[in-house]
Amino acid sequence: MAIVLDGSSLTIEKLVRIARHDEKVELDPAALERIRVCRAMLEEKLKAHEIMYGTNTGIGEFSEVVLDDEQVKLFQRYLIYNHAAGIGDPASQESVRAAMASRINVHAHGNSGCRPEITRTLVNLLNKGVTPVVAQKGSVGACGDLAPMAQVALLMMGEGEAWYGGERMPARQAMTRAGIPVPGLEARDGLATINGANLLTAMSALQLFDINRWLMQMEIACAMSLEALVANMKPYDVRLHRLRGFPGAIRSAGAIMKCMQGSDLQTGKMKTKVQDAYSMRSSPQVIGAAHDAVAFAWQQIETELNGVGDNPIFIPEARLTLTGANFQGSPVSLPMDMVGAAVTMVSVLSERRLNRLTNPALSVGLPAFLTKGAGMFSGLMLSQYTADSLIVEQRILSTPASIQSIPAAADQEDFVSMGMNTAMKNAQILDNGYGVLGIEFMAAAQALDFRTFTAGKGVRAAHTVIRKHVRHLDEDRPLYPDHDAMKSLVRSCEILEAVEKEVGPLDTPN
């Protein structure tokens, strides 16, 4: 069944299905009628020569330049040509698909003033698998993602490039093969296609979905390391966290305890320290803080996905045109900067547990660097170096982009969100996070091989999956294939799926 885009019910999960799994979309009939009503009002205002920004005026510094009737017809074409000014490698196809879906949802409110043919064409592009080629770099996050979205708008004129059937080709060729008519651009159509923070929001939405699953795997790795380090289990009692009240910490402690169901540590059979180091016992608070950051950003992004990110905005029932700044990306870029920092923070915590697993002074009897042949062999010594190098890059990238505004357009656009930079750097932060977490998983599995007590059900399930991809390190071998295999394994979420099959969902309380 197609996902209905009605302007108010688009979730991150639905966006993932559209972007990654090619689920069909359908424009809600009531939304289509709203688009028609708004367009009719705009055309009446045009006939009356009422001044409307970006429709019969120039844009930015040229907003005071009024266009005559003939110029109005041509303006949208030149607007899109001018704004298709990105640079570099193309954005991923899933990101562009998500951006198009979010733009359809903006139009569904009936406040954008474009012709229905424009919105229908976006729907057809999604459903028939035609994806515009869009340079990822070039947006400053206000007025929205103008440069990348202009490359989407080029297809409305049969121009630009597109992916179709696994090939990159001229857009008109792709649309012809797919049987999609070229609608052309008339008054307002071009600006209504580009004037929102759609690509940065789309990328952020997909990242949040992945980060949530990464954090759940971080809890599994934490549980494995706690088992290997013979941890005192009192800090993970959910009652402790309920007394403080942070939802993320409550959730995280519950997930860790679920993974350790049936462990000799949980049943009190093992002698433990009275109190462990912060990198162990504060894991629920730290991972939980990241969960809370993700939850806030999730709310912000779903608000943006279901809001009217455009300028100007037309209100047909009041016959009103409002100009403002609903394209401004700050409501997304600010919380996503926080999320990027949260991923880095949790990666640092992971590396500190890795340190305790490999350091013989801290590992509660485990062999140095998790090898029996110390001296001849160095075990996982260099794995820590790799994790450290990834974290340094994460720290550099965690500098907020949302405070990096540079004035442009003759100071008419003198504060911008730089939200696209947030989205791009978060992609790299998360990619590094997959590597850091994969290395902790590998070390924890190696450490558990040296323990003889019974580990928890979830921990055992994770260990089994890891051993399908990376074998025990008996003697030194090149580790880069193992690191790459573990990074891919974390990205695939195979460990998460196996653990949840064994102990139930990790994102619900016990």
Model-assigned labels for residue ranges:
Residues 134-139, 317, 321:
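Cysteine-centered functional microenvironments
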Residues 2-49, 76-134, 226:
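Glycine-rich, flexible loop motifs
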Residues 50, 65, 252-253:
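Polyanion/phosphate-binding surface patch
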Residues 34, 64, 71-74, 78-81, ...:
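Feature of Fe-S/electron-transfer and energy-metabolism proteins
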Residues 2-23, 27-34, 38-46, 155-510:
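C-terminal auxiliary extensions adjacent to catalytic cores
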Residues 53-75, 83-105, 135-157, 173, ...:
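FAD-binding core of FAD-dependent oxidoreductases
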Residues 69-85, 356-368:
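Catalytic or ion-translocation cores adjacent to nucleophile or general acid/base/metal-coordination motifs
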Residues 126-130, 148, 219:
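Membrane-embedded alpha-helical core segments of multi-pass
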